[in-house]
């Protein structure tokens, strides 16, 4: 038993130090990159023939908070208008968000290339020549498939409907993707750091009824922000969120063809190409990024995080239950895509990591003579060190949370919404902040347990799916939506 305890203590020491180092890298990168607005992009200032054309695809489902402001943010980009096409996508005209999309099209169609795509009017799926079985069950892919096929130019920017971006974002993402200015390294895939902002009015607040937004913004601005930045700084593995991603259509079309990509199984030759290749999967954002990461494109880097630009997601009236359900879904759809990272995730949370650190300091004989070690091997010492480590962790989270929510890196102007201003309106009293921090930390392990160990189904965009070990999904009939029959014959992508 002493050998076992010593082994656990040594493992805890190594693990906690690794986590502390990763956090340090993330904190350094956050403060280095988000302290001021990034420099103006290069690509918009090139000659007209040298400016790459960008097709922005925005999938929409339901009335998201501040939907109008989020959608028009891509129409207010400083990128040349004749080089920017915006495709708004919705499942049907019965969707409550449809009038908002129509309003955007009416207001901007005279000056911008903006189009509205309705899934039920997609000739690939409906009409005399269509068949709903031509695509898998993924509702997001089915939503944007037509817009992707109609894309102008080669660059695709998929950005969720509930994301707001500043005016220079398109240009800086193109710079990163294409390697501007000349001599810079181009990438296969670029993305942004996501950040949630709860815009629920104070008079509508209630812990269980609206506290989910506070928990979500706490997660995104602390644990997620630190590790997302660190992993993308080191670049040892793909780490993407899927809120705002840019890549080349030519790359994705070619790399989803087994005849041109040897890492794909030959049996996938009958699948459609491009974005449609991933319609059998619920975790399409990660799988697209993963495929581009693992596929050879000479002269290109794998993934590039566009440091300095934030993808802001306003949230409103989200219950604690909805936060838990969203986190469970997030973990379950990624369980089989990044299994190792999912299994070790509890160890990067404050409660577990600090306990491993405290156990290591109060258990292992770090000196030949135990009497020379200044920390006693007692329960009192263990809990004291744990509390001290938690306090330091919370202090760092408090600092980085307020730093990110100050929105210092955002180019502010008259068109910037209140949630992007970083002003007093969005600041939280310390009491409210610490309650949200404690709540998120306490919920982390139960959420992980429920997601990873206690189920394989997720509900997304009104449809219930079963997630399989080969990363494919099948929609479950009689669970809110009619099954389209796709999913049972899907093979592995990776």
Swiss-Prot record:
Active-site residues from the entry: 285
Predominant subcellular localization, coarse grouping: Golgi
Class of the enzyme per the UniProt entry, highest EC level: transferase
Gene3D superfamilies: Spore Coat Polysaccharide Biosynthesis Protein SpsA, Chain A
Superkingdom classification of source: Eukaryota
Gene Ontology MF term list: ceramide glucosyltransferase activity
Pfam family, one: Glyco_transf_21
Cytoplasmic side: 28-337, 402-428
Catalytic activity, reaction form: an N-acylsphing-4-enine + UDP-alpha-D-glucose = a beta-D-glucosyl-(1<->1')-N-acylsphing-4-enine + UDP + H(+)
Spans within the Lumenal topological domain: 1-6, 359-380, 450-494
Chain span(s) of sequence motif (Q/R)XXRW: 326-330
Span(s) of short sequence motif D3: 285
GO biological process: glucosylceramide biosynthetic process
Intracellular or extracellular location(s): Golgi apparatus membrane
Membrane topology summary: Multi-pass membrane protein
GO cellular component term, pick one: Golgi membrane
Ranges spanned by the short sequence motif D2, renumbered to the chain: 160
EC number, as in UniProt: 2.4.1.80
InterPro entries: Ceramide_glucosylTrfase, Nucleotide-diphossugar_trans
Span of the annotated motif D1: 95
Physiological role: Catalyzes the final step in the biosynthesis of the membrane lipid glucosylceramide (GluCer), the transfer of glucose to ceramide. Glucosylceramides play important roles in growth, differentiation and pathogenicity.
PANTHER family: CERAMIDE GLUCOSYLTRANSFERASE
Comment field on protein domains: The D1, D2, D3, (Q/R)XXRW motif is a critical part of the GCS active site, involved in catalysis and UDP-sugar binding.
Family: Belongs to the glycosyltransferase 2 family.
Name of this protein: Ceramide glucosyltransferase
Organism, scientific name: Pyricularia oryzae (strain 70-15 / ATCC MYA-4617 / FGSC 8958)
Lineage, broadest ranks: Eukaryota, Fungi, Dikarya, Ascomycota, Pezizomycotina
